[in-house]
């Protein structure tokens, strides 16, 4: 339904074109759909575990920070574009002292870091503070997150050319809708150099319905019955 979506770019739907789905939440899911008659064949992927590709000096520093933090060379894009990624970006900015940490937010994050059984949702705390524009560190955290999210959605789009649409799902996008709307996401998505213009006509939607997975399961079950 139209009420289940928020459109970031109307684009021009081309029949018989793929549809791409990407969704950040606990992790980062990616998949695509290919039309087959009056149905779609669904293909999952593990695209969230592909390499995080930094696009500027700050993101290069973030990559190095995560390599040191996790003691690995390979840093997946999921390490950045996910709920845990939001926290890691915050910790990176805090530890590198890119801007001052507020005592209120800092206390909550440190309490979460010390908990063995996690009772705090730090990503929610950070995103809410950024949404209220009450904390510079949280605002910068979410700026990096949204840009990285957009860049990865653009990577998926360049590979598939999904003129059937890109659907941004997962548990985060709908909750930070104003940040997804302010232009940073789309700008990063379409920043693909010489081929960036290929993305101008791709429809881009944010999925607002948190039960979309359940709805899809029901529809698939009905298709099997028929």
Segments the model singles out, each with a brief description of its role:
Residues 1-94, 217-220, 224-225:
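Phosphate-binding/catalytic loop of phosphoryl-transfer enzymes
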Residues 61-226:
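ATP-binding/phosphotransfer module of carbohydrate and carboxylate kinases, centering on a glycine-rich
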């Amino acid at each position: 339904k139209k009420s289940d979506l928020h459109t970031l770019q109307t684009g021009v739907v081309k029949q018989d074109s793929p549809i791409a789905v990407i969704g950040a939440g606990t992790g980062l899911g990616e998949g695509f759909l290919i039309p087959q008659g009056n149905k779609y064949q669904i293909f999952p992927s593990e695209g969230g575990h592909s390499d995080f590709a930094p696009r500027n000096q700050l993101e290069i520093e973030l990559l190095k920070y995560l390599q040191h933090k996790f003691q690995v060379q390979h840093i997946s894009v999921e390490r950045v574009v996910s709920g845990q990624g939001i926290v890691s970006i915050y910790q990176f900015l805090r530890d590198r002292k890119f801007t001052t940490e507020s005592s209120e937010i800092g206390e909550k994050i440190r309490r979460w870091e010390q908990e063995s059984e996690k009772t705090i949702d730090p990503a929610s705390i950070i995103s809410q503070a950024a949404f209220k524009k009450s904390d510079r560190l949280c605002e910068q955290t979410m700026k990096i997150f949204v840009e990285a999210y957009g860049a990865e959605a653009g990577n998926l789009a360049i590979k598939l050319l999904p003129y059937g649409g890109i659907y941004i799902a997962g548990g985060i996008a709908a909750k930070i809708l104003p940040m997804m709307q302010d232009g940073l996401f789309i700008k990063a998505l379409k920043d693909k150099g010489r081929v960036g213009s290929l993305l101008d006509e791709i429809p881009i939607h944010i999925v607002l319905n948190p039960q979309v997975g359940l709805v899809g399961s029901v529809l698939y079950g009905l298709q099997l019955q028929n």
